Regions:
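Helix-loop-helix
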Residues: 1-293
Length: 293
């Protein structure tokens, strides 16, 4: 099983190493210190940028899938109410069939909303293995002995980017890990809350999907706290950067392409009306006219 896992991750590890070394060379060329932790940290940020740009088409699909799931929640609730209290196999099978039929009729795919996260997971683990290897002095692809030694010695605020909270011998690593985990939790909370408060119809706030989102608001910080202490500083930098990208990307989408019947959509309509009025001397040509009797 371990050999199979290695064979899957090996190409991704090589890709991660080449991208990091490419950015490291570019930053070194423009005058940054090759041995600086900032140079290696920015190389990890560059890796995030490359991955997230490649995932933009899937992000668009994710948005459509999420909206589709929100729109069919009333029908989903009706199906659930229809079979409420029925636990026999025939009823459960019938409910499953009706749910799948609803997905087919509306062209909704629940898995599409998870694709960006699922596809990022292998890259995340590949980066973990590369940084873990750096800490052990292992070379891979373009990461030569010289670069591995350089990356292993590189520090950020006194913490080595290949070090972890659990294995750390310095207070700097522990403090930086805690700060990064807090920032990761804050960005995730902000992103989820932004989605729920601004881009979900009032009618959808009481459905199971919305309830799950509310629970995740408080579960994610616990997940970060438990798992984050096991990951190298460099992986936490990757995690925080991708969280910031997600937050900014979602802000752009909510502002420019909001879900109908939401506070974000009302704000978007108000901005559009203001733009039309500005072009027409302060009068919105699409505003409803009042009839004087």
């Amino acid at each position: 099983m371990g050999a199979f896992f290695d064979s899957i991750l090996r190409p991704l590890e090589l890709a991660v190493a080449y991208i990091m070394v490419g950015f490291h060379s570019a930053f070194s060329t423009i005058g940054m210190n090759p041995g600086s932790g900032w140079t290696w940290a920015l190389s990890i940020v560059g890796l995030v940028v490359v991955i997230r740009i490649l995932l933009i088409p899937l992000f668009v699909k994710q948005i459509k899938a999420s909206r589709g799931l929100q729109l069919i929640q009333p029908q989903m609730k009706a199906i659930q109410e229809k079979y409420k209290g029925k636990t026999d196999q025939a009823s459960r099978q019938a409910m499953s069939q009706e749910t799948m039929a609803l997905y087919r009729e509306t062209g909704t795919n629940p898995l599409a909303s998870c694709l960006p996260i699922l596809l990022q997971s292998p890259v995340f683990f590949a980066l973990f293995r590369v940084l873990n290897g750096i800490g052990q002095g292992k070379t891979i692809g373009p990461l030569t002995d010289k670069l591995v030694a350089q990356a292993d010695a590189a520090t950020l605020f006194g913490a080595q980017i290949s070090d972890t909270f659990i294995k750390a011998d310095t207070t700097a690593t522990r403090v930086l890990t805690v700060v990064l985990i807090i920032l990761m939790s804050a960005t995730t909370f902000t992103t989820q809350r932004q989605l729920m408060m601004k881009n979900m119809p009032a009618s959808a706030l009481d459905n199971p999907f919305a309830q799950q989102q509310k629970i995740l608001l408080y579960v994610f910080p616990l997940i970060f706290a438990v798992s984050g202490v096991n990951f190298p500083i460099g992986v936490l930098i990757y995690w925080l950067t991708t969280n910031l990208w997600s937050m900014g990307q979602q802000f752009y989408v909510i502002r420019n392409n909001p879900q109908p019947d939401t506070p974000a959509y009302a704000a978007w309509e108000a901005r559009q009306a203001a733009k039309r009025a500005k072009k027409n001397g302060g009068v919105d040509p699409e505003a409803p006219t009042q009839t004087i009797v």
